């Protein structure tokens, strides 16, 4: 009888405790995609050339899944070159060819495999930068058909990244007149509804971006967001790599609800060689949502590398996150 009573008492205590926890959770402010701050990598695929090279090329990244698993990277940047055989290859340029994933398919598949095994991760931000081959002859200069290249990229995203694991402009717009109005009036999707997914962003401006907008007016039906211009109907995600000089502008965008990518360093600019964290600290303080680096982990001979303060590995955004945000609420894959 004692055992039965004790068991009943314990059960009652657990029930009351669970009720209390549930009530506390209900009182918490719901977290959204723009309430986070993550580490990103610049040219995430990059491997330094073998042999002597210039400083700008002299850095290497681990495979994308290792970056996600061991270094806490949640934002990636992939340069894509179109090949006449129809393949989309990934490398920096013809003088800097080495890559830890050779094709866009391989890069996406590597990240997707990790994502499927860690489905509570915050959304990946995957920036795709199309590169333009210019073929020269004595008579003319021919630029590869950009529209076809963009469509090839779009189709590979469709083929190699499932729709139910993709956050698209249509998902964010959700009936609003424009994408920009959806963000400023309704906000980004809830973080808990967005875990295990990815957002793709076209890292380009000018004619290339215009061509994409012509194909997908207002980004209706598109898989990718575009690098925005302030005030445009497509405005959602911005890239500003100068958090020192443009800190006020970045912070204003963050406060308005937009997502901003920035940079902590650039190999040839000397931050890593001089262990200079000024740019990193500026990017953190103005609320950049992703902070891209060439050095996401310690490297022999260099004292500099990037960590997001209080990140688990992802942190609460210091500008946009609600006061009751904690790193554990943002992401805790180890639990």
Predicted segment positions?
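Secretory targeting signatures
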Residues: 1-22
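Catalytic cores of phosphodiester-bond hydrolases, prominently lipid phosphodiesterases
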Residues: 21-335
């Amino acid at each position: 009888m004692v055992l039965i009573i004790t068991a009943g008492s314990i059960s009652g205590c657990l029930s009351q405790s669970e009720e209390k926890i549930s009530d506390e959770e209900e009182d918490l402010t719901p977290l959204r995609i723009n309430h986070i701050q993550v580490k990103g990598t610049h040219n995430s695929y990059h491997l330094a050339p073998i042999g002597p090279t210039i400083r700008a090329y002299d850095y290497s990244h681990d495979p994308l899944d290792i970056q996600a698993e061991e270094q806490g990277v949640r934002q990636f940047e992939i340069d894509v070159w179109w090949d006449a055989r129809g393949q989309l290859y990934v490398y920096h340029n013809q003088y800097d060819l080495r890559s830890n994933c050779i094709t866009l398919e391989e890069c996406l598949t590597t990240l997707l495999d990790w994502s499927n095994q860690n489905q509570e991760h915050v959304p990946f931000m995957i920036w795709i930068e199309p590169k333009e081959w210019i073929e020269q002859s004595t008579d003319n200069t021919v630029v590869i058909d950009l529209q076809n290249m963009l469509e090839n990229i779009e189709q590979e995203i469709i083929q190699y990244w499932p729709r139910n694991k993709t956050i698209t402009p249509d998902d964010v717009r959700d009936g609003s007149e424009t994408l920009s109005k959806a963000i400023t009036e309704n906000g980004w999707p809830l973080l808990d509804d967005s875990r295990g997914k990815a957002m793709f962003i076209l890292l380009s401006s000018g004619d290339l971006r215009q061509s994409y907008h012509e194909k997908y007016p207002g980004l209706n039906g598109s898989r990718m967001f575009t690098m925005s211009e302030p005030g445009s109907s497509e405005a959602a995600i911005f890239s500003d790599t100068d958090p020192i000089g443009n800190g006020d502008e970045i912070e204003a965008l963050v406060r308005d609800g937009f997502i901003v990518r920035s940079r902590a360093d650039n190999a040839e600019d000397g931050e890593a060689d001089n262990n200079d964290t000024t740019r990193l600290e500026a990017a953190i303080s103005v609320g950049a949502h992703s902070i891209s680096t060439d050095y996401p982990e310690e490297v022999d001979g260099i004292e500099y590398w990037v960590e997001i303060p209080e990140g688990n590995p992802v942190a609460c955004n210091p500008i946009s996150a609600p006061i009751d945000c904690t790193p554990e609420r943002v992401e805790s894959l180890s639990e």
